[in-house]
């Protein structure tokens, strides 16, 4: 068996879609294991950008199976829209498989998400208002509706009626909000279920059979480790587990079948939404990185917060996700800077620490300790090997690997497939 997990090591938007697309060339099955349409990934093929939110990046390889696993929360409306988008672009989706155990996002989840966020006022989390959190809440409360339920007219009607009655009481009594109509939701979403029915199956069987047959399986995470509900900057996190361990729960594949974990990061750091960000930049350098790196959310369109590379964050991600290989993206964005900085540790109340505090009040007091390196002025977007990089850029790449403590397998100097450079084949090393 041969399997590789791709995880984001920062706060999402690290370029996982691109690296997954790149690694998919040598995989036979590509599976997503958590999150929902709150995550966005951009793939560039022959200069054309494709933006996806639910469907795995592997969909662009028609001969390979693409899986939406049981750990994903699926908005059928968004999924049908994304399928239509791909079909209009001439992309076949016959290779898509959707877990019958995946949870369904319904309109009351989205309305509740908005109401809860508004009620928090200044303490808002910065949610994408996609209904992700409320859907996972229902899953944990054992009242969620699964894809298998959506396809059964009687079961869907019964469970929707019960859930909607409870949610409407909540909307009216607690939030003084408008109740939702059962008939409208039932008719619309049952129809969506029938549209996606052809793709639905027990995906754990597909994945385990593939691994047992010696096929190469690639698991694609959404968001990033620092948004993990257990290991991230709680409560400013998502509602699932992007860490590599989330694969086993979200796909139905046991931990003994995972071989490699590729951590994806940018040569700097970015974050969408609220929450701690020790190396955040508020000056013209930060603005320059944001504009050159096109740092605006794929899902929200919001400007991303940007900062220097944080090796404290990266070592935390390496530890909790068991990262074996590193993919360093967007090195080209730093071109033109006289100096570049890497955070090597924090100063907490006068004491140097090299771990990421769980206590947010302590984290607010952490000041980054930087190591400065000379920058480079050259345009590196056409570089196709480590040796072709300017010396200062090459030294930067090597220093990142040293500080994180993981060997760098690939580095990227732009968004295109051809701009990803291999230092070590992840598949060949298994």
From Swiss-Prot:
Cofactor(s) the record lists: Mg(2+)
Active site positions: 13, 41
Chief localization: cytoplasm
Catalytic activity: IMP + L-aspartate + GTP = N(6)-(1,2-dicarboxyethyl)-AMP + GDP + phosphate + 2 H(+)
Keywords from the UniProt entry: Cytoplasm, GTP-binding, Ligase, Magnesium, Metal-binding, Nucleotide-binding, Purine biosynthesis
Entry's cofactor comment: Binds 1 Mg(2+) ion per subunit.
PROSITE patterns the record matches: ADENYLOSUCCIN_SYN_1 (PS01266), ADENYLOSUCCIN_SYN_2 (PS00513)
GO biological process, one term: IMP metabolic process
Top-level taxon of origin: Bacteria
InterPro entries named among the record's database cross-references: Adenylosuccin_syn_GTP-bd (IPR018220), Adenylosuccin_syn_Lys_AS (IPR033128), Adenylosuccinate_synth_dom1 (IPR042109), Adenylosuccinate_synth_dom2 (IPR042110), Adenylosuccinate_synth_dom3 (IPR042111), Adenylosuccinate_synthetase (IPR001114), P-loop_NTPase (IPR027417)
A GO molecular-function annotation: GTP binding
Enzyme Commission number(s) from the entry: 6.3.4.4
Binding positions (IMP): 13-16, 38-41, 128, 142, 223, 238, 302
UniProt key word Protein biosynthesis: no
Gene3D superfamilies: Adenylosuccinate Synthetase, subunit A, domain 1, Adenylosuccinate Synthetase, subunit A, domain 2, Adenylosuccinate Synthetase, subunit A, domain 3
Recorded GO CC terms: cytoplasm
Family (UniProt): Belongs to the adenylosuccinate synthetase family.
PANTHER family found in the cross-reference section: ADENYLOSUCCINATE SYNTHETASE (PTHR11846:SF0)
NCBIfam families, A to Z: PRK01117.1, purA
Physiological role: Plays an important role in the de novo pathway of purine nucleotide biosynthesis. Catalyzes the first committed step in the biosynthesis of AMP from IMP.
Name of this chain's protein: Adenylosuccinate synthetase
Record organism: Streptococcus pyogenes serotype M4 (strain MGAS10750)
